[in-house]
Amino acid sequence: MLAAVLGAVALYTFIGFIPGTDETSVLAPVTLALVLSGAPPQVVLSFFVSAVVTLNLMNGIPTALVGLPGGVMSAPLMEHSVLLRNRGLASDTIRKMAVGSAIGTLVSIPLSFALAGLIARFAEPIKAQAPLILAACAVLLALLGRNRILALVAIVPMALMFEALPALYHATHIIPADKKVSISFFLGITVGPMLVTLLELLNPRRREALPHGDRTRTALLRSGFRSQALMPGNLVTRSEGWWSTAMAALSTPLFMLSPVGLTFLLGEASVARMKDDPVRRSQRAVTVMSALTHSTYLAGVIIPLVALGFPVSGVSAGPAMPLFEAPPVYDLDHQDRKSTRLNSSHARLS
């Protein structure tokens, strides 16, 4: 188990530095390979949790330093990270992200296991109504945003597209009828803005409107690396710590909602009244959002896996899907108890 944890830290430390990565594309294949290798479910879960913590933490570095989203979960932090970078506070931003990540992890893991114990008794009704619950969560998340009507309307074409693409693949025999296809649209959250920016360079007017000047001078400072300065209590203010703790705890029971959406909504809610000082506002936002990136992701895999044994969240149906379905080791198609106990990581963990 320790080897799996250390391996995840080593691997995703390097992957996390690469901007624009998709969590599903970098977490799911390695997790699937580990499951198919015959590793015990406790080892696989430890690996996955370690990978999530490391990846989300390292994704904050390119976000803070160069203004590029390290991953899908870094997208909500972009605006505040760029503002702080322009003020010369990139190194402070990385430290605040690290403390926020630690807070989110420490709050979410025990709370997720506690909630899983409470929800386990309602597992069968939740499984039976999973499609309706997920649809209701999508509507709720749309209503919590600013452009409510547009968000509600957008659900329909997105749902049609996700149903139409597998049907098209089966109809054209690209994929056999008895096989499944998984669609991950999360990569578009990070790659989409980059592609739009590159396409804008083809427009002469847009190109001329871009800032032009000399080379940017960069200086690396050693300030803030004293042992006392690296204490968590000196890196974040008391309000930033309390807001991070509160929002991480609040997001954990909402594990069925989108982790990106929760990170943005709850993170912005924590700074809604801070309009006078943009720097302090952004510092609190990056701290709270870093806590939320960890709490939402960890709750999204721990609670469905431990309590339900069925993917009912975006995380469990995406990056963590090999923990639920990885034939022939884990198979959701087996409905009877004997088969379920033989083919379920949920049963082996319980």
Question: What positions do the PLM features span?
Answer:
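Transmembrane-helix bundle segments that line or gate the permeation/cavity pathway
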Residues: 106-117, 121, 128-215
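Membrane-interface alpha-helices at helix entry/exit sites of multi-pass transporters
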Residues: 41-46, 83-100, 276-288, 316-317
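Transmembrane helix boundary and interhelical junction motifs in multipass membrane proteins
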Residues: 17-29, 59-63, 71-74, 257-266, ...
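Helix-loop-helix module between adjacent transmembrane segments
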Residues: 15-16, 94-110, 255-256
